């Protein structure tokens, strides 16, 4: 039996995004939980973990953001196959290796089988690098990674019983990276699988810079010396150096967000140009524009 669970702060978004995806893939005996007003994401997910730990015959817990829609019809077959390895603790659809901070995208992304759907600039979609597998880069692969993106997590029964989100880290940022580090430290694997999802999310990747910086620092301090490569950088471990590194990653995240916005604006601008050029006023004034061009060329 699988449990599907979300920590819900916007019920209308859950109904529009997560719920249809769950209905698409859930089995007859699956349990579906929507925990409303959970406090922080850490707290909400821990409540769901505690509840799932009491389910007899649990095969796996699917944790998904309320704005995430599962779109793989064969989702259950792929997560079952991944969890058939008793050493696997976490399964996701976006993952990276060489990750040492909460800015996991600074590592080498090995799989990004998701679609980023946004509302800004008239709305649009930005596909991840392996959303369309035939167009994926040669480096794309399924399998073991350092961390997965937390908008979709599938957890093994062992993880449900033994690992919890660290509520001391803050309210949102870094929860997935820290959780994956805990799972790996316990000797289990974090992997990606051939499943796809749509993440309905703003183009703003870091909405609260201070909470980002604090989570970055806390996770670096927590894992210093515990996991090779995590939090490491040249120089001392003074607070100033930690904060400087956190601010650097923050600005990189903002730059990535700006790049997303630029790509998102292009279709909107193209639509506006097309609408203008096919409008009645554009057609009516076409002779006048032609005369103006002739007049300008004769001067």
Task: Label every model-predicted segment.
Residues 188-211, 218-222, 235-238:
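Active-site donor/metal-binding and catalytic loop motifs
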Residues 1-24, 32-35:
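N-proximal low-complexity "stem/linker" segments adjacent to membrane-targeting elements
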Residues 120-155:
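A recurrent flexible, glycine/aromatic-enriched loop bordering the glycosyltransferase active site
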Residues 58-69:
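Short beta-strand-to-loop acidic/aromatic patch adjacent to the donor-nucleotide binding site
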Residues 147-150, 157, 161-198:
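Donor nucleotide-sugar recognition loop
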């Amino acid at each position: 039996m699988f449990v599907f669970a979300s920590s819900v702060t916007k019920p209308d978004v859950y109904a529009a995004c997560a719920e249809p995806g769950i209905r698409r893939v859930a089995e007859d005996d699956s349990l579906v939980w929507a925990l409303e007003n959970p406090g922080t994401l850490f707290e909400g997910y821990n409540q769901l973990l505690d509840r799932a730990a009491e389910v007899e015959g649990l095969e796996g817990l699917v944790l998904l953001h309320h704005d995430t829609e599962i779109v793989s019809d064969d989702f259950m077959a792929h997560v079952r196959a991944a969890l058939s390895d008793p050493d696997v603790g976490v399964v996701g659809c976006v993952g990276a290796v060489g990750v040492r901070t909460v800015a996991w995208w600074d590592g080498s992304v090995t799989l990004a089988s998701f679609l980023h759907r946004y509302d800004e600039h008239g709305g649009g979609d930005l596909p991840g690098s392996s959303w369309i597998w035939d167009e994926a880069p040669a480096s794309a692969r399924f399998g073991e990674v350092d961390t997965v993106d937390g908008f979709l997590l599938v957890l093994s029964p062992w993880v449900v019983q033994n690992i919890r989100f660290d509520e001391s880290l803050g309210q949102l940022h870094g929860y997935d990276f820290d959780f994956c580090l805990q799972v790996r430290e316990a000797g289990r694997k974090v992997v990606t699988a051939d499943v796809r999802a749509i993440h309905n999310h703003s183009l703003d990747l870091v909405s609260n810079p201070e909470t980002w910086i604090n989570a970055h620092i806390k996770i670096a301090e927590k894992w210093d010396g515990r996991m090779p490569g995590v939090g490491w950088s040249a120089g001392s471990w003074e607070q100033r150096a930690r904060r400087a590194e956190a601010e650097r990653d923050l600005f990189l995240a903002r730059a990535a967000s700006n790049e997303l916005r630029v790509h998102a604006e292009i279709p909107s601008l193209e639509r506006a140009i097309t609408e203008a050029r096919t409008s009645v006023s554009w057609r009516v004034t076409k002779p006048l524009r032609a005369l103006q061009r002739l007049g300008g060329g004769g001067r």
